[in-house]
Amino acid sequence: MERAEHIYQKLVAICGEENVLRDEPMKHHTLVRIGGKADFLVWPETYEQVVDVLRLKEEYELPFTLLGNGSNVIIRDGGLRGIVMQLKHLNRIWREGNNIIAQSGADIKAVSRFALEQHLTGLEFACGIPGSVGGAIMMNAGAYGGEVKDVLDHVKVATLTGELKTLTNEELELGYRTSLISRTHDIVLEVVFALQPGDYGQIKAKMDDLTFQRESKQPLEYPSVGSVFKRPPGYFAGKLIQDSGLQGKGFGGAEVSTKHAGFIINKNNATAADYIATIEMVRKTVKEKFGVELELEVKILGEE
């Protein structure tokens, strides 16, 4: 039996045939609708399956990529080698006291809505963030003055070798769009958010206002990765790009949004090469005009 088939059969034995795909085009699994093929895409249904896949990866010395819901990532056209794991089945959300516990694959927007239903305040800022809970922890996601760091109590993670452990807010070293696990690549399994009782009407009004701001300013009618660049100290990335005259410009099917210059949209079947070339054009032009280096907020993965 060839090695790839052997690995496939082992993955099927762990996760079930319906949860293992071979040579899967990743453009179907990223919000920007871009990306080459993954050798193996797996969707574990339990923490035990996550650990078993990690141990298999170790045994066969396979490359490994954990993907959230594909919101903040560009996968190159050559795709991803080895195993790609998504935790979309691990999506439970529940309440214990004033804490909300969410599994890594849950949508952070769904957790924000659940908090509203439970009359708990603290997660309003997340009502429009397009991402999984695990991804939100890794990036210390934030919007409109709030961030994960403000409400996170602790997380359960699996290390890349399959060891389970708990990390507190302090141990996670949460900073602006970064965390300890963005460097260690530990896999978030479960998250505890510490919230406060609040007034349903006030919580809903704040979420409605943030949703309106987002929908009126962001180009949600086209696929994109969301905000491409981090906020440079003392500036706004979108304003620098706008003042550089780059809106409506790009390569191939990728284009700097005319609605919000901080977004690059997939306007017409863009490839990853189109998208990355557009990013580099923006960075180069802003550096030349304003002397400001734009840092990426998105992750670029895979082979060219």
Curated annotation (Swiss-Prot):
Its cofactor is FAD. Disulfide bonds: none annotated. It catalyses: UDP-N-acetyl-alpha-D-muramate + NADP(+) = UDP-N-acetyl-3-O-(1-carboxyvinyl)-alpha-D-glucosamine + NADPH + H(+). Residues 34-198 form the FAD-binding PCMH-type domain. It holds the Pfam family MurB_C. Keywords: Cell cycle, Cell division, Cell shape, Cell wall biogenesis/degradation, Cytoplasm, FAD, Flavoprotein, NADP, Oxidoreductase, Peptidoglycan synthesis. One of its GO terms (molecular function) is FAD binding. The keyword Cell membrane does not apply. Its EC number is 1.3.1.98. It is found in: Cytoplasm. The keyword Oxidoreductase applies. The active site is at residues 177, 227, 297. One of its GO terms (cellular component) is cytosol. It comes from the Bacteria. InterPro entries: FAD-bd_PCMH, FAD-bd_PCMH-like_sf, FAD-bd_PCMH_sub1, FAD-bd_PCMH_sub2, MurB, MurB_C, MurB_C_sf, Oxid_FAD_bind_N. Pathway: Cell wall biogenesis; peptidoglycan biosynthesis. GO terms for biological process: cell division; cell wall organization; peptidoglycan biosynthetic process; regulation of cell shape. Cell wall formation. Belongs to the MurB family. This is UDP-N-acetylenolpyruvoylglucosamine reductase. It comes from Geobacillus thermodenitrificans (strain NG80-2). The lineage of its organism: Bacteria, Bacillati, Bacillota, Bacilli, Bacillales.
